[in-house]
């Protein structure tokens, strides 16, 4: 297999994504059963963080350890990345010493530049534009709880941010209808809306957007780097809080997701995460299993897979 990267969901085919989801579920079952599976002995993951994280670092580092490999944490404070070394130089050097690299950063162009000059697979662990690893976990979670998401209705409530953008790509790749309920001025990128107009629509009224929905998803009102806008956003997004009563408008089998961290009393009511229709804890854990499946796929030519 030629060198592959995972910068957005569009880098993989529909079949590849569906296979990844199923493999992630298999890996979850194996881990829960206490099965030891270590295909990455002698392999190293480089983890480049320019944005702080809880779930991303723990899931990648733990996943690499469970696979028998090693993970190295790199922050701008610890490397030449924070001292002005060109990205293309860093990409060449770091990729010569590790087997795979994940990057959590701000501008999406940074991961694109890294991928261009890297000799090993690059994983986008979050940029301001996209968050594809979270979508793998979300699709795995829906698959485990409700089966195929194809032809289902998904409702995104809130900011048209990087998570929303990745859900738009997922709607196309996995074949579901996505409704976006966002305040005026906070809609998704217009180019993405045009590109995915066949499967994505804007619905002004959040109650209408939730009607008959199979999955309702939201995220924080102000993402990392937008803290100065918090008060303004709180006023604009107040009508878009997700509550159990909003889920009552949806399909009886609806599930609720949030990539976390969540701000109870803001984008969700205080009781939303504990609602029986919430699957956020499985969703959070599945970052581990989905990313293990992803790394296994990207390095499959370098490891010995089970027969």
UniProtKB/Swiss-Prot annotation:
Q: Give the protein's function.
A: Reversibly catalyzes the transfer of the carbamoyl group from carbamoyl phosphate (CP) to the N(epsilon) atom of ornithine (ORN) to produce L-citrulline.
Stated name of the protein? Ornithine carbamoyltransferase
Listed A to Z, the keywords are: Amino-acid biosynthesis, Arginine biosynthesis, Cytoplasm, Transferase
Cited InterPro entries? Asp/Orn_carbamoyltranf_P-bd, Asp/Orn_carbamoylTrfase, Asp/Orn_carbamoylTrfase_sf, Asp_carbamoyltransf_Asp/Orn-bd, Orn/put_carbamltrans, OTCase_ArgI
Q: Which organism is it from?
A: Psychrobacter arcticus (strain DSM 17307 / VKM B-2377 / 273-4)
In the record, the note on similarity to other proteins reads: Belongs to the aspartate/ornithine carbamoyltransferase superfamily. OTCase family.
Residue numbers binding L-ornithine? 162, 219, 223-224
According to the UniProt entry, what is the EC number of this protein? 2.1.3.3
Matches recorded under Pfam families: OTCace, OTCace_N
* Cellular localization per UniProt: Cytoplasm
Its UniProt pathway annotation is: Amino-acid biosynthesis; L-arginine biosynthesis; L-arginine from L-ornithine and carbamoyl phosphate: step 1/3
Q: Which gene encodes it?
A: argF
